Amino acid sequence: TRPARMLIDHEVITEPALSDIEIMEFQDAGRLEAFNTDGLRSLLSTMNHIPNLKEKTLRFPGHAALMLDYRNQGLFDESNIEKTSKKLFQEWKLDENEIEFTVLDIIIKGEMKIITYHLYDEFDLSSRTSSMARTTGYTATASINLILDNLFNSRGVFPPEIVGANINCMEFILEYLRQRNVIISEKTH
């Protein structure tokens, strides 16, 4: 588990992965813990005009402590990772009709208001598609359709935030997801 990079006051800082654990309550997902992980990647350079950016992973309470324990036991060391991975994949395998979910909150704190974008998606029984496949896979196929429909015709490799900065591209992707019942809500407080 690599260290978590984030922007604090326009500076890239590093914190240990699985640190800064907090409990969050969701109406649809229940009680989850959030902890630092290294998910910002390209956002650290493409969005460095934003003073503070932090990404946390959500899991059921106790997950971070378990992973820290595994790390401290050396189970994620190069010599043990294959055995550990095999064990974890077996333990985490879902039953055939077990409902899993994906939840994502993007919280934007301004001087005058806070805007939260919320996504909650579950396993689709009719198509037998996991929520993670739906939320990431449909976004990828929407991006391919952007190119096929000539809505995005720049050449090269672009991180998602550059594509999404084009309002037409962003609206196309959100509508593509909506048509597949992947809904992102917006709340201002």
Question: Model-derived features: where do they sit?
Answer:
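C-terminal catalytic/substrate-binding lobe primarily of soluble NAD(P)-dependent oxidoreductases
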Residues: T1-H189
